[in-house]
Regions:
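Structural/interface elements that position substrates and couple domains in central-metabolism enzymes
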Residues: 1-66
Length: 66
């Protein structure tokens, strides 16, 4: 199963990161290319405890950002 999340703001990025870190094939989509670039490099555009750790774990597993 592939899951697509449109909008990588606070809720979208958190949800996308957790789903991917749990092993779901996940695609996060956002119109802001600069934000997508940061996220693809494992950097969150905002602070949430442990989010960057979860994001990087998801990127290693099954997370794509577009």
């Amino acid at each position: 199963m592939k899951i697509g999340i449109v909008g990588l703001g606070f809720v979208g990025l958190s949800l996308t990161s957790v789903l991917a870190s749990k092993g779901y094939n996940t695609v996060g989509i956002d119109v802001d290319k600069e934000k997508c670039g940061k996220i693809s490099n494992g950097n969150s555009p905002f602070f949430e405890p442990n989010l960057e750790k979860i994001l990087r774990n998801g990127l290693k597993k099954k997370l794509a950002v577009s």
